[in-house]
UniProtKB/Swiss-Prot annotation:
Enzyme class: transferase
Known pathway: Pyrimidine metabolism; dTTP biosynthesis
Protein name: Thymidylate synthase 1
Source organism: Bacillus subtilis (strain 168)
Source taxon at top rank: Bacteria
InterPro entries: Thymidate_synth/dCMP_Mease, Thymidate_synth/dCMP_Mease_dom, Thymidate_synth/dCMP_Mease_sf, Thymidylate_synthase, Thymidylate_synthase_AS
Assembly: Homodimer.
Length: 279
């Protein structure tokens, strides 16, 4: 049993047994297949903590880990909002939110790429500022990136679910705390938890720190009603030992990472489970 499997199953069980339904409300989300309202059961304010002795990825079902990393590179490295850039990587998970101009508006990578921080007399974006500050001002309590920009929320195809990171350097270790305003536990959470841990490992490597603790906070923690049956099946499945994530140790620049610099070794998992998408 992995740390992630254990915490994940505990939260799913809590939601199914104690979650509050939103069926009395008109909801924004609709089922992609038929356009009917996509209702949820939810609980609020959940936290997952990992000591990073193992990579947090589910073993009770197959997680498309390469797709998760490609999405991460699209947002954090390319700082792109262009869905075509993601399609070029063979990834189509954002196609439902693609606008007429081919982008997701001013969301995700667009916010990270805005040059709105001052550094040595120049304007830099959030990622470059973070990397510089972690190396040169490690004791700062201001190592934060923010995707939730109130001035531009209406210009986003989808407001960010994972919206904030805060980084801490303590005794030579790089700790990461992530905040998600909302998490779809069947589809979004397994991706997000894994990919932001990969981000932590990447940034620790290029800044020269050891890997510290990883904390993932969720505001609205929910399960869509059409996902419940398959989640119950998933919770009863055999759990395996965590795999090993290999990251090419030769990469010293954050922008030099490619998908070929990652390998998931000995990833044993249950069969893939299909969960319908709500948009």
């Amino acid at each position: 049993m992995t740390q992630f499997d254990k915490q994940y199953n505990s939260i799913i069980k809590d939601i199914i047994n104690n979650g509050i339904s939103d069926e009395e409300f008109d909801v924004r989300t609709k089922w992609d297949s038929d356009g009917t309202p996509a209702h949820t059961l939810s609980v609020i304010s959940k936290q997952m903590r990992f000591d990073n002795s193992e990579v947090p990825i589910l073993t009770t079902k197959k997680v498309a880990w390469k797709t998760a990393i490609k999405e991460l590179l699209w947002i954090w490295q390319l700082k792109s909002n262009d869905v075509n850039d993601l399609n070029m990587m063979g990834v189509h998970i954002w196609d439902q939110w693609k606008q007429e101009d081919g982008t997701i508006g001013h969301a995700y990578g667009f916010q990270l790429g805005k040059k709105n921080r001052s550094l040595n007399g120049e304007k830099v974006d959030q990622v470059d500022y973070l990397l510089h500050q972690l190396k040169n001002n490690p004791s700062s309590r201001r190592h934060i990136t923010m995707l939730w920009n109130p001035d531009e929320l209406d210009a986003m195809a989808l407001t960010p679910c994972v919206y904030e990171t805060q980084w801490y350097v303590k005794h030579g270790k790089l700790h990461l705390e992530v905040r998600a305003r909302s998490n779809d536990m069947a589809l979004g959470n397994p991706f997000n938890v894994f990919q932001y841990n990969v981000l932590q490992r990447m940034i620790a490597q290029v800044t020269g720190y050891e890997l510290g603790e990883y904390i993932f906070n969720i505001g609205d923690c929910h399960v869509y009603t059409r996902h419940i049956d398959n989640l119950k099946i998933q919770m009863e499945r055999e759990q395996f030992e965590a795999p090993e994530l290999w990251i090419n140790p030769e990469v010293k620049d954050f922008y030099d990472f490619t998908i070929d610099d990652f390998k998931l070794i000995n990833y044993k998992h249950g069969d893939k489970l299909l969960f319908e998408v709500a948009v």
